[in-house]
Amino acid sequence: MLKIAILGRPNVGKSSLFNRLCKRSLAIVNSQEGTTRDRLYGELHAFGVPAQVIDTGGVDHNSEDYFQKHIYNQALTGAKEADVLLLVIDIRCGITEEDAHLAKLLLPLKKPLILVANKADSRQEELQIHETYKLGIRDIVVTSTAHDKHIDTLLQRIKLVANLPEPREEEEEGLEELSVDEHEESEAALPSNTFPDFSEVFTEGFSPEEPCTIPESPQQAPKTLKIALIGRPNVGKSSIINGLLNEERCIIDNTPGTTRDNIDILYSHKDRQYLFIDTAGLRKMKSVKNSIEWISSSRTEKAISRADICLLVIDATQKLSSYEKRILSLISKRKKPHIILINKWDLLEEVRMEHYCKDLRATDPYLGQAKMLCISATTKRNLKKIFSAIDELHHVVSNKVPTPIVNKTLASALHRNHPQVIQGRRLRIYYAIQKTTTPLQFLLFINAKSLLTKHYEYYLKNTLKSSFNLYGIPFDLEFKEKPKRHN
């Protein structure tokens, strides 16, 4: 995979360029210096080959700021990792001492290096290009990311210095045909006007004691799982990422709000790829005092929507806060499978460990039957178990429960606990199917919705949850009345 690193001093437009290249707003763009702190990764789809763009934080080697040392190291790591380097400067300011320092730092790496003279918003500013020659960089492209000027020229230059081949026409046509075919695929809809009579389906041919097993789906190439790490500031999300990857990819500090961007990190483990989304901590809106914090908070909500599975990280040494309850509510509303990671487990006393999880489940209804994993990012206790927990949860979500097993399970539930009689009638379930996988939903055909009580609906839902191991997987039951026959 071709990797392209964007480097430069603070506030020259690196994140704006990153967003232009990736065609979506991944990096936070703001006039405040130091907005980007960690390395951000995005996909570039312009060359016909897999390509990745790395956005690094603004470098100021003379600064004594605590974060600058980490940002500097992150930028150097990104430069060493990349195949092509883009040094971004602000053409309106001329060549600064920091620009010259970065050029001297990058030239000895002997990698393709392009100087991006950004913020050339007018023709007069474009003519200042002669100032840039003193840096000793041969390839120079003048751009204005604010006005989307000359981005195509930059892409062509990247393609040239990276020696990328021209895509063959046959391959492009094949890709177009494939995408058209995929859009034409659709699931057959259930008939809404006629249903077979399954009145006896729950009274014959089953054994309540017989265990249900879900057959696995046919083997397919494993998809890249998008995993969002969610939690309030300073609970250890970035430490968990660094522990899983065995390298410092996220800047860690005790100050809440160290992570500002959502950081996409692609990682391979046992033949499967995981895209970890390390999010900025979610806060109450009234405590968000500036635009950067507000954008970070909204990005956390977007990360939940993007993710296949959410990992909610909580601090074992602190009580469950209203922030975490809000996150749990968001995850549930988005119908996202999730796992609760209880971090800083090493700091708990043994006496508290025995009752902690039980007490925690009692604090919020969403935690009642969620999957929990006690970990320590500091000692790396149970960190590797996170992968197996994710895989297990994904396996349950991606394997559709066969219709006969759904019906058999519900038949057993009715056999154990009969619905109550309401006005001389009793609820009957004729037939049931798993309607969708993501989000998970079951469709039950019944005789009358007026005979279904909330209590019995809750009982049916718990039966399906325990039978098919749906813990940590929000799902819905949809009830549909069977049309009455007309003679």
Swiss-Prot record:
Entry binding sites for GTP 1: 8-15, 55-59, 118-121
Record: residues binding GTP 2: 231-238, 278-282, 343-346
Region span, Disordered: 165-194
Any single GO BP term: ribosome biogenesis
Coiled-coil features, chain-numbered ranges: none
Stretches assigned to the KH-like domain: 399-483
Keyword Repeat among record annotations: yes
Source superkingdom: Bacteria
Domain named EngA-type G: residues: 2-166, 225-398
Comp. bias (Acidic residues): 168-187
GO MF annotations in UniProt: GTP binding; ribosome binding
CDD domains, A to Z: EngA1, EngA2
Pfam families noted in UniProt: KH_dom-like (PF14714), MMR_HSR1 (PF01926)
Alphabetical keyword list: GTP-binding, Nucleotide-binding, Repeat, Ribosome biogenesis
HAMAP family the UniProt entry points to: GTPase_Der (MF_00195)
Entry function: GTPase that plays an essential role in the late steps of ribosome biogenesis.
Quaternary data: Associates with the 50S ribosomal subunit.
Family: Belongs to the TRAFAC class TrmE-Era-EngA-EngB-Septin-like GTPase superfamily. EngA (Der) GTPase family.
Protein name per Swiss-Prot or TrEMBL: GTPase Der
Organism: Chlamydia pneumoniae
